[in-house]
Amino acid sequence: MTDTVIAPLSALPLLADLPALAPELVLLVTAVCLMLGDLFYPRERVFQQWLTAAGAAVALALTLSMNFSGGATAFGGVFRADGLAAAFKVVCLAALGLTALMSEAFCRHASMRQGEYYSLMAFSTLGMCVMVSAGDAIVLYLGLELMALPIYALVALRTADPRSSEAAIKYFLMGSFASALLLFGLSILYGLTGQTDIAEMAHRLAVSLSVSDMHTLPAAVVALGLVLAGLGFKVATVPFHVWAPDVYEGAPTTVTAFMSVAAKTASFAVLGRVLLQGLPQLSPLWSDALAGLAVLTMLLGNIAALAQTSLKRMLAYSAIAHAGYALLGLAACTPEGLRATAAYLTIYLCMNIGAFAVIIYLSARSGRGRMGEGPDAGEDLDDYRGLAARSPLLAAVMLVFLFSLTGIPPTAGFMGKFMLFRAAFAAGYQITVVVAVVCSTISAWYYLGVAKRMYMQDSQDDAPATSCAITGETGLQAVLAVCLAGAVLWGIFPQSLLFWINVYF
């Protein structure tokens, strides 16, 4: 009688699949605890910061400890615990942890409510992990919205700054439009295949195309265009980039750092899954389309960055350009290209978060911009004039990040671009690679322009005062140390990064 009542765990498929959701469950518990902690202990700001970082670290450890051989699925295939999900999920979780560590100083300076801030960031990362692991179109879309909605609120969280509210409105309107395009494209694919499972979509579409159905190919091409447009907005590729400069500049600096890395990485993972696993029959079309988008994105991002006087806005256009570089790996339509994209986004995590950490350090050390009274210290390029004389160590750290963003050896940025260029070249996109090399040369002008201000120009009278040592901010110190190590060591010893990437692909 007991045997018929108490079923073994293997007979309970929902419970048996829960371990695949372990990182997501940790993030969910962390977000809920942050909300409750802010309700009962609103003054424990440092605790909220370290709780967020700890939750991200535990979720990251669980992700790294999972066995992804064979591409396991859960909950009937709607959730995939495979290598693609793990590699990109690691970057999103690391971005959450690093952003949390450097947020307390900025939130204190900007007088932002930290309980909502950290919980929204945790919920957004939860959405990223869900969409990265989605094996079903419906789950993918739900994860995307769970990622986007908290970011809309995060962008507007600095209520005293009118730029923040303006950026949030722009981002919400453009994001809603892009989500509608993506949903429309997925609905067309569902109409063609009768399936929401991404892998099954590919099988049904292959059958329809093999029998020369005259209606299938045109409809599939339209769906492909809508999916590229919807996800192109999330990645900030040309011509879907128009929101990025204003939103990146107007959002709180920590939010800009988070969304420029984590949201971009999750969107690239979804783009890779939908194209490689859902639409492989259309690869001749979408690979050429991605190569064309990459060229436009690299050119516009780098050329527009030349004219900027705000470092945050310059980094916004730089993020657009880096999205173009990352597209080269997907355009290659090969396992090597996907590995190169994952490796590059991992490196981009270190060099971009590190650059924003320097901006936040200058902001925290200055009273300028407090309570939304104009731009924060560190946002304008002229704030970096004479930084080497005022804070030699901080200037040296920033110089490493600038070299890595440019792609100058022996930094990790060089190795990341080399892997992408090699994959694209092997796939037959030689001219595209030449354009990418030219664009990297253009980027040296504005990146090294910051270095020129730091080392070859005198400080302004109103330049933010900084000490000669990076002291007083434990979280920022940790972020700068981790990002500096990644930007340097992965350039000198790229085998360590390649070994980790090869484990998943």
Curated annotation (Swiss-Prot):
Membrane topology, as annotated: Multi-pass membrane protein
Location (main, coarse): membrane
Transmembrane segments: 20-40, 59-79, 83-103, 115-135, 137-157, 172-192, 220-240, 251-271, 285-305, 314-334, 342-362, 394-414, 431-451, 481-501
GO molecular function, one term: NADH dehydrogenase (ubiquinone) activity
Catalytic reaction list: a quinone + NADH + 5 H(+)(in) = a quinol + NAD(+) + 4 H(+)(out)
Gene Ontology CC annotations of this record: plasma membrane
GO biological process terms on file: ATP synthesis coupled electron transport
Keyword NAD: yes
Compartments where found: Cell inner membrane
Pfam hit, one: Proton_antipo_M
EC number: 7.1.1.-
Keywords: Cell inner membrane, Cell membrane, Membrane, NAD, Quinone, Translocase, Transmembrane, Transmembrane helix, Transport, Ubiquinone
Superkingdom in the source lineage: Bacteria
Family to which the UniProt record says this protein belongs: Belongs to the complex I subunit 2 family.
Annotated function: NDH-1 shuttles electrons from NADH, via FMN and iron-sulfur (Fe-S) centers, to quinones in the respiratory chain. The immediate electron acceptor for the enzyme in this species is believed to be ubiquinone. Couples the redox reaction to proton translocation (for every two electrons transferred, four hydrogen ions are translocated across the cytoplasmic membrane), and thus conserves the redox energy in a proton gradient.
Subunit-level organization: NDH-1 is composed of 14 different subunits. Subunits NuoA, H, J, K, L, M, N constitute the membrane sector of the complex.
Name of this chain's protein: NADH-quinone oxidoreductase subunit N
Organism field: Desulfovibrio desulfuricans (strain ATCC 27774 / DSM 6949 / MB)
Gene: nuoN
